[in-house]
Each structure stands twice: as structure tokens, then as C-alpha cells.
Amino acid sequence: MSEKKNLGHNTKKNFLNKPVEHIDITSFDSRDIISSMQKMSFVSRETGNAASIFNEMLKDKNCTIFLTLAGSTSAAGCMNIYKDMVKYNMVDAIVATGASIVDMDFFEGLGFKHYQGSQFQDDSELRKNYIDRIYDTYIDEDELQMCDKIICEIADKLPPKTYTSREFIYEMG
């Protein structure tokens, strides 16, 4: 396992200088490369096989497709993919972690960004700059706390009762 090190950034501005970009799957046709991956090895072959299975699921009118998400995939640049999968009726239901909805989607909906970083960066250097890390992605802790404050304000305005996740997300907008 690699040792963590200071990669020479040293200032918050230097750490947070490359926003993660969310891919637009409607801007290119990847079908040929994905299907050709079935003839490769390791994760490439599994990616090609998964795409083939997913295409069969889309053709089957009796198939219910669940998209399950972890928060880190949204931060990694997949939000537009999920949006387009819903828009083009490629999924029937989404099961997501709270982090996916709150700390990733809502966070970016407020105009904040996730930034490209390094999994090898010394976390103590990040901590000095008030930066959080999800593997190789950085988040400005000040912005994350602003997001949390807004969520608290939303919750504080609600009548006291038990809310389902769906009800609370609705209140978030």
C-alpha cells in the first residue's frame, strides 16, 4: 500500500483547483467500445457483459430495473448519468444512500463542487486546509458545513413528526 505524502499543493486554492466534471452520456456513442470490451479481460470484460445484460433488461417489458447508488459515485462525476437514466426511462427505481442525496447531489445543487485530488495525499495536510477526501476526490469542509446548516434550517422549519426519507427529500426541494 502506498504511503501518504504531501504532493506539494499546500494551500486550499491549490488543492481545490480542478472541479470534477460530470460526464454527458448523450454527447457521444460508446456502444461499439463497450460491446468490444466483452472480448477483453478483467473489469473490461465484466463491463461489456454488464452492458449486454442491461440492454436485455431494457428490452424486457416485464423487468423492473433498480439503480442502486453509493454517495461517492455522485461525487465522482456520475450525476448526469443518473439523471439521463431516469429521463430516458432506463431505470424504474433508485435506491440511494443518504450521502448520495444529501452530501453529494444537494451539495452540488447549492452550487458547491467536488474536486479532483489524489488518494495518496497526506490527510493531515488536507485537514490543515479544512478539506475532506473521498478516495481521490476533495470537498471543501466549509462548504459541506454550509450545506449541513441549510439542511438543518429546512428540518427546523418542519412540523415535529416522523418523516420518511421521501418526505424529507421532498422538503429539501
Give residue ranges: language-model regions.
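Metallocofactor- and cofactor-centric catalytic cores in central/energy metabolism, strongly enriched
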Residues: S2-Q145, K149-Y163, E167-G173
